[in-house]
């Protein structure tokens, strides 16, 4: 980072400055959720309701400048002046820029904070954002009028905060703790103004690093260092080259077009331009349940589900497995129906095994080529290995739910039949399979997928592959929202820790089996923690044909519990 220092601004005693300073001091020691932007309104609790102990009995008046006094400031709080100047972060990667923001905030690692996302207009999961970003840069002028901070080197939490930590993995209590107290504690607040240009290069942009750096240099020269700031035509020029340029100011009078005139208004209208933090968990040594809270906060910061969904998000962070297990796959080649795609081409045998998982929520599906010749098509289900707590009152083993029901397409309904290669050979029934009696808001309960089976209708050379699903009722729940997902994991860049990768399910094969691998899309269709709000269940699926391949598409739903 480059930092060109300027002189101190003359700071008059203004009502706005006094109010902002007082609010900044009251924010020190309060809880904060760092998935939010750095604004005082995101502090937890009422003003002055600190999570850490502050010596309140030895307050004093602070003389800040030219007789400007700030009365009744606790002895454990320091206040200092800052130096104005230009700062830049040269062209770097998504993760490098995220780490720069974290360093400014006193937070370790490179998982993006809320202030980073807010400045660069990121709203999705960081995995998707990082995959879509080629490079980032920023340049700006910072006017830090005052920096207030906790002077104590050793912070101590109030006892009621320590007692509020759940002693076990209880998603509801953990979510409540984070909502009430945040993830970190505010240790310093900087007030003043900043005028920053954020540059975001998308993956599709052909521009070299040198051209973006030249633009940054021009911005420094013309926007920040000339008496009358000149307009920069760069954003218009770069718009067609997949470069997003974002201008943001904080503090001062934003109606002033000129940077120089805007800077003069900052002392009379300062705002919060930076905050630093310390993790709450760093002050909880020896507290029962610390590891559970640490894990909950780490998951929350990494995936950033909406706070109102955090309980359900945490509840679904259970190990996942694929059914059938690899050890249970048949070693002996079974007798199967088959599909033929051309007169002389290889046959694709279809496993008609029913794959069921009982009362374990299904989160994904995939097609797989199996057997010694990789010529037998089967279907696999990804499921949670245990039942989330939120579902236990509705779906535990003692709860009567009735017999699960298989549902599939009509054999004679040829409207859904699509040829895989040629019309005179095998087809696929593309009929959507979903429980038609379940509607959004239905109070009688919902039906979710707990099993799947492939089958073949024998129409001579025009055999038809079809899908059946097993539906089980979940009483007392309703469907909140449903979506059909047509994006396989592999092509969307999503990551699923611990799950088999798409490459492992599409083995390199040769000869006839290699031809079959080109006909079957074995990409994993699933939703995990990176698919916000992170507690999706499978409620339907359908087979399809795309570009000569048999594909699987899945319907996911969120439940109201």
UniProtKB/Swiss-Prot annotation:
Compositionally biased, Polar residues: which spans? 500-513
Specify where the region named Disordered lies, as residue ranges.
489-514
Pfam assignment, any one: MACPF
How does gene deletion manifest? Constitutively activated HR-like cell death phenotype with endogenous accumulation of high levels of salicylic acid (SA) and constitutively activated defense phenotype against challenge with P.syringae. Dwarf plant with normal cotyledons, but dark brown- or black-colored cell death lesions on the true leaves.
In what tissue types does this protein appear? Mainly expressed in the vascular system.
**Superkingdom, taxonomy of origin:** Eukaryota
What SMART domains would the database entry show? MACPF
Tagged with keyword Phosphoprotein: no
BP terms from Gene Ontology: cell death; immune response; plant-type hypersensitive response; regulation of salicylic acid mediated signaling pathway; regulation of salicylic acid metabolic process
The UniProt keywords, alphabetically, are:
Hypersensitive response, Immunity, Innate immunity, Plant defense
Residues in domain MACPF?
A: 11-314
The entry's function note states: Negatively controls the salicylic acid (SA)-mediated pathway of programmed cell death in plant immunity.
Q: What is this protein called?
A: MACPF domain-containing protein CAD1
Name its species: Arabidopsis thaliana (Mouse-ear cress)
Gene of this entry: CAD1
